[in-house]
């Protein structure tokens, strides 16, 4: 459920796009396979940490076919500095095996195909689609969720319903808005001590957190 007027929504959208016009994901990847692995690893883990892990990972498993044949212990060792590495290692191998078996070794770029893979939920699928295919989809992580609620763009209690509210509010440029909101939440509208004084959305903010020290 949206809480802002159409005028406010359009202004918020315009400012986010203006301030993050050329921004891309901070994850480092070269192709769709690497993108999917990075996004799967990034759950409950910082992009910086993922970027430290992946060079050795991709040197060991340069394609989905190599990962599909990987030894579980080897994958765990390579990603052990990442949160929930045990589950992620299992899902990475299962994901790769499914891509080889069901998609001829090519990571699918449709939502149903992606969500059929182990460890891939709606958020992960949407990030892969917007980054890998330029799809007009929204993805809600912890930063986007926080920003959406502080700006009064949603009252929803789940990421999925928040995604629906944002998609209905913004309609277009959803991928760019997702990336802008991620970076805005990461560096300006932080969970603790948000930088309200230098915020380009300050006067449009409806959050109680606006006066945080």
Predicted features by range, described:
Residues 2-213:
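Catalytic cores of DNA base-excision repair glycosylases
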């Amino acid at each position: 459920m949206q809480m802002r007027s159409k005028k406010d929504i359009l202004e918020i959208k315009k400012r986010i796009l203006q301030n993050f016009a050329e921004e891309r994901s901070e994850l480092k990847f070269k192709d769709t396979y690497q993108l999917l692995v990075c996004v799967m690893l990034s759950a409950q883990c910082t992009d910086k940490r993922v970027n430290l892990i992946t060079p050795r990972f991709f040197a060991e498993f340069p394609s989905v076919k190599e990962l599909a044949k990987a030894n579980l212990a080897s994958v765990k060792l390579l990603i052990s500095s990442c949160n929930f590495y045990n589950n992620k290692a299992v899902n990475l191998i299962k994901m790769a095996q499914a891509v080889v078996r069901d998609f001829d070794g090519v990571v699918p770029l449709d939502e149903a195909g992606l969500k059929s893979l182990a460890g891939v939920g709606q958020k992960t699928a949407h990030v892969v689609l917007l980054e890998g295919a330029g799809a007009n989809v929204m993805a809600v992580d912890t930063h986007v969720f926080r920003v959406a609620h502080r700006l009064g763009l949603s009252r929803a209690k789940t990421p999925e319903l928040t995604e629906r509210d944002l998609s209905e509010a913004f309609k277009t440029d959803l991928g760019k808005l997702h990336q802008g909101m991620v970076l805005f939440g990461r560096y300006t509208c932080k969970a603790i001590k948000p930088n309200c004084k230098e915020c380009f959305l300050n006067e449009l903010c409806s959050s109680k957190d606006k006066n945080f020290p």
